[in-house]
Amino acid sequence: MTINHYSLMSLCFFALALLIKSMPFLDIELLKFFNSLMFSELFFAYFTEIGNGLVCLAIIIPVLSYFSHKTSLNSVKIQTLVMVGLIIGAIVKILKELASFSVRPGYYQLEDINYLEPVFSYNSFPSGHAATIIGISFVWISLAFRGITTKHAGLIISLVIFLALSVSLSRVIVAAHWLSDI
């Protein structure tokens, strides 16, 4: 049995999340650090919503599918990415029900944190926005680049991963989630 790079990276992120979750003071300090990066509430109010399942369904999935269809990459069907989004949504919903005790940063109303409205208090783990954008991005990358070597593959993959990670981290920047939730 071989383990691919994405599985190994996922295991590393999972281990890191468990480590951070076991040290709440570290989660709070990381929240303060990332929250200090909020340079525009208007920008982040929209940017963080890129990970929303409906926005992914309406914009991200069609753009990724169209891009893979119109270039030399493998064509990734919209239906495939929609199914991935639905499966991720169901898994996140189940995990949120199982971890309903997890509180969001808004529960504590920390004084030196700039919260972006609306402020929710519960169901922090996992971040649905982060799971959706990262899941769809990684599935698209693995299908679009399977067996293909193009000159710009590294650049395209890096841009898609950068966008997915930026949207995921924006959930911490707007104080909707802890870093260990994403």
Predicted regions and their residues:
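Alpha-helical transmembrane segments of integral membrane proteins
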Residues: 4-12, 76-84, 152-159
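N-terminal transmembrane-helix/juxtamembrane module of multi-pass inner/ER membrane proteins
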Residues: 1-59, 96-119
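Membrane-embedded catalytic cores of phosphoryl/pyrophosphoryl-handling enzymes
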Residues: 2-3, 113-182
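Hydrophobic alpha-helical transmembrane segments
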Residues: 50-68, 129-137
